[in-house]
Swiss-Prot record:
Region (Last constant region): 1-31
Any single Gene Ontology cellular-component annotation: extracellular region
Organism annotation: Chironomus pallidivittatus (Midge)
Tissue distribution: Salivary gland.
Name of the featured protein: Balbiani ring protein 2
Entry annotated with the keyword Coiled coil: no
Keyword Secreted: yes
Unique region as annotated region, ranges: 52-162
Stretches for region Last Cys-1 repeat: 32-51
Length: 162
């Protein structure tokens, strides 16, 4: 199984929608079902890399994305997910998620707030102990931030649905 063969077999395997194992040069036909251990990996297009953070359906608490979040991530991908939760749960069926590794983006600031404001269910927003550069946000600011975020999400949803 040399590199040339790997490439050929891998391409063939991709065409039939299988999963290629480079160590054995074998192709396993893969049926993608929305089962309890389905994981979505990052997809790349020419224009934009869309990172799908920790979207293992076997770890529902970590699911912090729906279509609208995808749109935001396309343009502003940073740590918009719970990294610890991600590390613990992003190994469904051995799938590896590069997004779950430590990233080199700043640990605080806008995306830190986003990560803490997004709740997995229902598009509600919750700001617990949100800190920006070591300073806690006042409840008034949290409320304003949540409102601005909801308006933005609503606006984006309207565009997507139009």
């Amino acid at each position: 199984c040399d590199d040339a063969m790997r490439k050929t077999e891998s391409d063939k395997c991709t065409n039939i929608g299988g999963k290629f194992d480079p160590s054995t040069c074998k192709c396993t036909p893969e049926t993608v079902t929305e089962g309890p251990t389905t994981c979505l990996e990052s997809s790349e297009s020419d224009e934009v890399t869309t990172k799908k953070p920790c979207d293992c359906t076997c770890a529902p608490d970590c699911k912090r994305r729906k279509m609208i979040i995808d749109v935001l991530l396309k343009y502003f991908y940073r740590d918009v997910y719970d990294k610890d939760c991600c590390k613990k749960n992003c190994d469904c069926d051995g799938a590896k998620f590069p997004e779950c590794e430590e990233s080199n983006s700043k640990q605080s600031g806008m995306f830190d707030i986003l990560a803490k404001l997004f709740k997995p269910q229902g598009g509600d927003f919750e700001a617990g102990s949100v800190e920006v550069d070591g300073k806690k946000l006042t409840s008034e600011k949290k409320e304003k931030f949540g409102k601005a975020l909801q308006d933005a999400v609503k606006g984006l949803e309207d565009i997507l649905n139009s």
